[in-house]
Amino acid sequence: MATLAAGLGGCQTMSDITVSVASNSEPGPNADPQRAVEVYGDRHRANPKDAEAALAYGQALRANGQRAQAAAVLEQATIANPGNKALLAAYGRALADNGNFQQAFDVLSKAHSPDNPDWHILSVQGTTLDQMGQHEEARRYYTSALKIMPGEPSVLSNLGLSYMLSRELPKAEEVLRQAYADPKADARVRQNLGLVVGLQGRFAEAEDIVKKDLPPDQAAANVAYLKDMLRKDNPRSGGRKPVPLAQLSRPD
């Protein structure tokens, strides 16, 4: 499937790994994901109950696309370290990566508290609700996150996609343009805005937006894919195809 319509919660990067580097033999933040899996995996196996080692290994597995294994490692770590909120947050994210949205939401609820909420976790909880079709409830979580971190583009992007998923495209565009205007907005925000603009039939404008992060031929291919998808989306066929899913931001 084209990049413009990438899967929800697109793949994580090595920037997810925030633990400190203890020696030159360990991978840095831009290291090869497979190398990180090997190094942090060795550390974890040497001391399976160590919370920091499990967290680093789980995040490395997520970055390398090994989602089920990441969830399994982090689940065991939360059992060995009950109440560790960093591990609960990572485990919840891994569950969401793996498509276990209700379980992810429940675990993430334990990773922070109403008297000390974490905007990152609120935003991820919103994405899990959106993926279960609970869009109104999801937006309450995004709104709470934005009260803590006003104007945060990753949260605004998720809020915009929530409106897209319920086919409120003008509202989705309005919110995504707020995110797009922020200098901190990343490629996901731009791709998501391009998607929403394209879904409204403004293909040339959509291509201009997405080609800022993609080679011209890839941007054109994505827009062509979107045109073809919309052309085939005929209500008279007896059913309506779902809106293509974009990239929800899961800040870590």
What spans do the regions from the language model cover?
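Terminal, low-structured helical/coil segments at or just beyond the last alpha-helical repeat
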Residues: 15-19, 183, 187-189, 196-252
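Structural marker of alpha-solenoid helical repeat scaffolds
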Residues: 46, 80-81, 111-115, 148, ...
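Canonical tetratricopeptide repeat
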Residues: 56, 90, 123-124, 158, ...
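N-terminal leader/linker segments that initiate helical-solenoid repeat arrays
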Residues: 2, 7-56, 60-64, 72, ...
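Helix-start (N-cap) detector for alpha-helical repeat units in TPR-like alpha-solenoids
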Residues: 51-52, 85-86, 118-120, 135, ...
